[in-house]
């Protein structure tokens, strides 16, 4: 058993490499071994241990980069690095352990592998909302290396795609049990599903060329190090870097800066003057991330992470407050119990905003605004494209250096465009800034650590809403029923 535990841990680590930026797709078949070893376990306690070790390795290699974010302020948070590196995998591994525990009780069922896959998606869904939720690196994101293979997102959403991916990934498990009839069924159904996916994706990509609106947009990526972002001595240098990248002889309609690009209120006279000079010279509207408050005092004072728009006459065209906050980063959960401060600058916790949509009247542009972490929640983002024209996602991935974190965050965010049939404008302080069309094609992008800007046009949205945007997880359930039906029909053909 000791040897099997080591194998589970190592295969779990390997399985974490299926995500961006490595996309080591052969590692998906580590899940076939997990499916097999759970069925082979002597009792549910053993199955739970195998699942836990696999899960610990999976989340350790897939989410190690969170510890890099903690190390940015190492003088204050050195003690938190091992908790970030090992603590999160220790907690998240329980979801895979629970999946394996329940799957064990179905080990003699003819449809054991299907049950394993259904439970996998169930626990991914639970992980997306329990304790504020962390739907990061859902297994469906392993296919985001291919714009063709992610097209089912428009029907199933990410949870439906996760079911497809975990089904295919466990299709080789009868190799270990030497049940070759079952192997034929699973491989045949997986090949059929993949074929349908490729045909659907290829047709969708080829029949939906990227069309553009007339709205010109400039995405500014200054790549300011996190240690310099809130440094008072660096403030004017940082602001002028933004302005210098924004001012250009080429005309534009919108200039977009990243999350918390303005770390002070925009009504400070010297700051206001610089911004108005820039906007008058470019004749553009600025959309930027910043901080905002409710203008109250004492116990009623509230601070928000905001996205707002300013025109050349100093009119604030909209203001959006982030509603999905990062625990421990933007606020401290259980603050009365835990004697720690949050990672982000300042002693005051951010407060949740109300979410919603915003509008720029001049361009008749209806926007779904997303600040950083909000883009990972598919149901929060889900929007009928009849009432929205574009998703604007501002973020700051400078926390995570050259790790896999910024790449994973980009591909997760990009998936929201496909799900909703909406273009996405994504602007990072450092990370990956891009113009993405409504089927997930990357029109233009800036890579990690680039100091530059993108000039382009906002792509047009699709003319009809996607199935996922209209029906949400109900469409995902229908896709699962479809795959179960394929599995059942092929079992009738191949069963001896």
Swiss-Prot record:
Residues 220-464 form the CN hydrolase domain. It is a multi-pass membrane protein. It is found in: Cell inner membrane. GO terms for cellular component: plasma membrane. It is an enzyme of class 2 (transferase). Pfam families: CN_hydrolase, LNT_N. PROSITE patterns: CN_HYDROLASE. One of its GO terms (molecular function) is N-acyltransferase activity. HAMAP family: Lnt. Belongs to the CN hydrolase family. Apolipoprotein N-acyltransferase subfamily. This is Apolipoprotein N-acyltransferase. It comes from Rickettsia prowazekii (strain Madrid E). The gene is lnt.
